[in-house]
Amino acid sequence: MKIDRRLLGRLIVVCLVVTIPIFILSINSFAAQATKKMGDIFGKTNSNQILLDIEAALARAEAKLGIIPQSAADEITRKADVKYLPEEELAKEFKKVGHPMVAIINVWARYMDGNAGEFIHYGATTQDIYDTSYVIQLRAAAGIILNDMREIEASLIDMAKKYRDTPMMGRTLGQHALPITFGMKVGVWIAENRRNMERLKDCLKRLNSGILKGAVGSYAGLGEKGFEIEELLMKELGLAPPDPADWHGVKDNFAEFGNVMALIGMTYGKIGQEIFLLQSTDIGEVEERLPSTAVGSSTMPHKRNPGKSKDLVVLSREIRRHAEVIMDWMVSIHERGQISSADQLEEICLKTDRLLKAAKPLLKDINVFPDVMMENINKTRGLIMSEKLMFVLGEKIGKHTAHEAVRELSMEAFKKKISLKDAVLAKPELAKYLKKEELDEIFDPMKYIGLAPQEVDRVIAATMRLRETDHF
């Protein structure tokens, strides 16, 4: 088959014109990259430094108990710096031995004076060091995440206060239900965000110590002072006393952390989806604040597409998938199965960081259109007040009788495209029970927002009390 090269060239140009802008937009979006601070926590330099810090702390603990010479512990501590792990040497050694920890130990030991290198990693197993390093990294990552969530919480509190009394349509199953206030909707976001913060704080109470129990968790390589060495190591690292049981083959604390990240992700995914939908042309009640120069489409100049809210939905799904993989670590083989991968812990933290960095500007500066909210309330011509009408009529003719009567009125109003109030007035047998002033009040949506404004006050008060307990 003969290929028309001119046509092929045009197709390539079209593909580039369409895909390159999309690629550029995606990498430059607020959610495209994690912050440098979060990235550095899991970067190679910091990861290796943490490993050296743990090994040095182990040496100091063992020296205190007379297990290794103090001079060796001093030298190991003095050389606990990644400058003694040149990348080229490390890569060459890893290629030779095929084991990351052994490669680190071998290269590092060459820089030790005397025989101090012989006492590096004394009695420990690789998983002891790595699992402890993951705890340190996750706790550092959690601090960033909690601070971001707290900052977002403050923005949401301001928003809830501002729109405490702003009526909007409450929707169930995608249909108009009853009026609420926008402040009440934001209050739901505040409460869910705070519950996730408390979950993460609780999780950190358990994810607060490392492990040093040897190859199969029996302390065999550490001897009779194994318990003391482990406890001293955790004290040297500023961690809590160790768990008495081996958890190399369990990983439930990591799984819990992953699931809390998933919950955080899904909360913001829901918020993002809500803003995405409320911004749609057919609803138009809120809008992401965009610069006047923003371009929504390469072919449709009128488009003002939601970007950050979409990012929240996408990232929430990815975070949940990482949590599922981390959960699988719990199904280990015997005492330890080596089926876990630190990459998943790193990725779930980086993506949660990206998600929160997208959420911060979105929720701090969003356009809200109260007039459109009121237009949407009036769109169904009073049908949303059917519940209140039913309760008022129910006092006169009985609740169940009133329910059926109002249901029939609602269907008639919907079919004839008239207001529910007019449908009532067209039925003298029902209208006789209601005075004009009573009817006017029944169909005033502001008179049927329940305790929505007071609910906002209660949510904010409860949240402010919990904010006083934040220490991270």
Tell what function each PLM region has.
Residues 250-285, 293-349:
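A conserved active-site cap/scaffold subdomain adjacent to cofactor or substrate pockets
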Residues 161-183, 285-303, 334-340, 364-384:
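Glycine-rich cofactor-pocket loops
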Residues 318-399:
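Long, amphipathic alpha-helical stalk/connector segments used for oligomerization, subunit docking
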Residues 365-427, 461, 465, 469-471:
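C-terminal alpha-helical interaction appendages
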Residues 66, 312, 352, 402:
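Residue-level signal for inorganic ion chemistry
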Residues 13-24:
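Bacterial N-terminal signal peptides
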Residues 27-213, 218-219, 223-232, 236, ...:
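A helix-coil-helix interface module used to build multimeric assemblies
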Residues 3-15:
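Bacterial N-terminal signal peptides that target proteins for export
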